[in-house]
Amino acid sequence: MLIRIALFRAVGERGSSLKPGTMKQPASLDAIDRRIVSALQDDGTLSNADLAQTVGASSASCWRRVKALEAAGVLTRTVRLVDPGAVGRGVNVLCNVRMRSHAIEARQDFERFVDGRPEIIESFSMSGEWDYLLRIVVTDVGDYNHFLMQVMLGHPSVAGASSHFALSMTKYTTAIPV
């Protein structure tokens, strides 16, 4: 079985003071900076020499630019992407969550709960009818049923949930357009 693993520079970092998707002043990027960011999103293992050749800059200039992009928070950590099916987590569930209360303490308690659950790999605070949208990866429907009934709905901040099972993933990328 072939496992596709890619390395990339992630935008945002778990536990950072500014989470991905949080509004902040965008960095001023010129054409070379944009090519660097795009190249590193495709392959974070590129050596500085290969990156410089790819983007059409000198090695020294490329190194300085990467360091500046890191300092500006444009480039953060380097991670490996894992095929969820290859590790037995091939079922994707999108779960809408409604909170019992919108008090800051209830939201913070729920967000701490989410941070502590490894099967919840993405979480968004939402506007509209539902308060949160979670992406959850599990082994099978029974695994999700246990998580939903015994864990999620048992949390004191949760009033209700609506689950949607992905039949297939038709697009997946971690690359942010620059």
Where are these regions (language model features)?
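A compositional/biophysical signature of low hydrophobicity enriched in polar/charged and small residues
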Residues: 1-178
